[in-house]
Amino acid sequence: MIPIITIFSVVRDIELYNTCIRGNVFCCGANLQFVDNNAENKAISTRYNDFLNSFDFGKPSWMVFCHEDFEFREPLAPLLESLPRDALYGPIGCTRKGLFPFRHQVFLGQIEEMNRDGSGKPWTVGRRVVPLTKAETFDCCCLIVHSSLIEKYNLRFDEELAFDLYVEDFCAMAKVKHGIKSRVLPFKATHHSGSKPNDRLYRHLPYLRNKYPHNCFCASCTYLGTPPLAMRFERWLAKLMGH
């Protein structure tokens, strides 16, 4: 049976959205929904929650939350047809490898990146992995989840994270609260972003440390929660003080 797929995006650059998604042959057959964010420029996390709050869960669907500049370069339907519905999926995520103190971030999954204005040549980000490899979080560019999982646990995005780290946090919260795993779903795609982390992103880190005082999750450009070294020091101090 061909799976029902709903692709939702928050859009400010209509022309780019038309190129990457609405006019993309690989998105044919999917239910394309978007919100024009030019007038109000609401938080992406808020827009995603608005979509979820208005969704008819009586009509189950795979949900794809992706940026307006995320270009699918192969059809999703064959990949989702027999995919378990009890996990979160994305084309590129992150985890940690190695032993302390040499533990480091590793990308899982591989996509192309390209400058938003089309200049230059695309470059490859990440590394190839076998399908369903476990990740800690996914990049915000694309998250895939079945509506039945959203409905079962009433999953929502944290609106304190307006434009950054909202997908990474979604993965972290799903894991901490409900034990939901994040698994890499490799497919060909190009992210027409070419952007680098900004100061706004890093301003969220104190909030996330308070939110996850006893957990740490690897993201593509930072850590969510309590950094590994700090976690080790706090545990050592507590043990020393007999707590």
Where does each model-flagged region fall?
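Short, well-formed alpha-helical segments that are part of the catalytic scaffolds
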Residues: 4-7, 11-28
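A short beta-strand-loop structural module common to alpha/beta enzyme folds
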Residues: 30-42
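Glycine-rich, basic loop-to-helix element that forms the pyrophosphate-binding segment
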Residues: 41-55
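Short beta-strand-to-loop acidic/aromatic patch adjacent to the donor-nucleotide binding site
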Residues: 59-71
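Acidic donor-binding/catalytic loop of UDP-sugar-dependent glycosyltransferases
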Residues: 68-82
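Conserved catalytic core of nucleotide-sugar-dependent glycosyltransferases
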Residues: 81-153
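A short, conserved alpha-helix in the catalytic core of glycosyltransferases
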Residues: 137-153, 159-187
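Active-site donor/metal-binding and catalytic loop motifs
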Residues: 182-208
